[in-house]
Amino acid sequence: MELTWFGHSTWRVTVGTTDLLVDPFFDNPHTDTAPSEVAVDHVLLTHGHADHIAHVGAFADTHTVGTPEVTGYVADETGVEDTTGMNLGGTVELGDAFVTMVRADHTNGLETGYEYSGGTPVGYVISDAAPTQTGDGDATTFYHAGDTSLQSEMKDVIGPYLDPDAAAVPVGDHFTMGPMQAAVAVDWLDVDVAFPMHYDTFPPIEVDTADFEREVNATGSQADVHVLDGDETVDLSDAL
C-alpha cells in the first residue's frame, strides 16, 4: 500500500492496482500538484466542506463514494455522474481495496447559496482485505480520520476491531482536534505509524508538528510519527 499526501486532508491511497483519492483539495500551500496531474480510480469524500470537496468536479468522470447526502450534492452541483452513497459501518469493495466508512465527530455543511447541514461527517478505513475476525491477520490497513475531534469510537471500535496499521489524523486544532487530542487518538488506535494532516493550510490551523510528536510520546504510544512533505509518497510496508 502506497500513500501520497497532497497537503491538508488530501491523500492518494494505492492498494494493489487501485488508486483512491480522499478529499480532493489542491488549493493548499503544501502541494504543487494540479488535479489534472492526478489519475485515480475512485474518489472518497469525508464531508461537504469546501476544503475537502473543492476539486471533486475535476474528477467528474471518476466513481465517487460518500454519504448519500454528500454524493447527491456533488452529483447535482459538480457534474459527478458515477456515485455510491453508503453509510456508517458499511464496507465497499473498490478494485483491490476494501473501504469501511466510520464516524467522524465534526459538522458537515453543503453550500447552495446558503449552507445547510449535510448529514454525518465520516472517516474511512482502507484495507487490502475484507474486515473479518476470522482472517489470517496479514491485511495492511490505513485509517483516514477525516475532520474530527477525539471520539470514543476510535478506542472502542476502530482500533480493536478494524485494527489499522497506520492513521492520518488532523492536528491543526480550531476546526478539529489539536496535537494533544490527536496523540490520544493515536494511542487509542494502537497504530504503528501516525501521519499528521489538516494543519498549516491557513492561519487558524498553524501548528508545530513537533508538538504532536511530543504528545504521542507522552501517551506511551509506540507509534512512529511520520511528518510528510507535500506530494511525498511513502510505501506503508517500508514504514511499518
From Swiss-Prot:
UniProt keyword annotation of Hydrolase present: yes
| UniProt similarity note | Belongs to the UPF0173 family.
Name the source organism: Halobacterium salinarum (strain ATCC 700922 / JCM 11081 / NRC-1)
State the InterPro entries in the record: Metallo-B-lactamas, RibonucZ/Hydroxyglut_hydro, UPF0173, UPF0173_UPF0282_UlaG_hydrolase
Name the UniProt record assigns to this protein: UPF0173 metal-dependent hydrolase VNG_1038C
Q: Which Pfam families match?
A: Lactamase_B_3 (PF13483)
For this UniProt record, give its keywords in alphabetical order, as a comma-separated list: Hydrolase
Task: Cite the HAMAP family for this sequence.
Answer: UPF0173
